[in-house]
Amino acid sequence: PSNRDDGINIASWPVKGLYQPDSIAAYTRHGRTYLVSANEGDARDYDGFSEELRVKDFEDEGTPLDPDVFDPSIADDQNLGRLKTTSTLGDLDNDGLIDEIYAYGARSFSIWDARTGAQVFDRGSDFEDITANLLPAQFNATNDDNDSFDGRSDDKGPEPEGLDVGNLL
């Protein structure tokens, strides 16, 4: 999740995603209703308040990463240092240290059981995997700069905005 690691580096990190879908649709299959979410994510940023904080800046803001949970190198720019996260979550035991890192979006789409709220499917890193394989020069690129390879990796990656649900006959 760095836009300064000089490449396509899809990996698992100890980060939780705030799904925050921009689009939700419903469908019914075999009498059961499901919700589909496009998990974009979005920071709250208003006059007088912004929750957005890069991982490397937690310590400067007075809430360092818990050294019992995270190796200090995780805050390096080539690791998670540039990842934009929320400053409002993560101190689980109220000791002033961040125990969990929460980033915006899940970079995927998910299917949820509408009755129980349980997640029944998540596409995982497929958007990034497919782009890396088919259009590597556009991997996590922005939509407003022609030469922006990897420019969105520290934000929300492929940033799924919308979805449609249909029937195949």
Feature locations, PLM:
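Beta-sheet-rich non-transmembrane sensory/scaffold domains
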Residues: 1-169
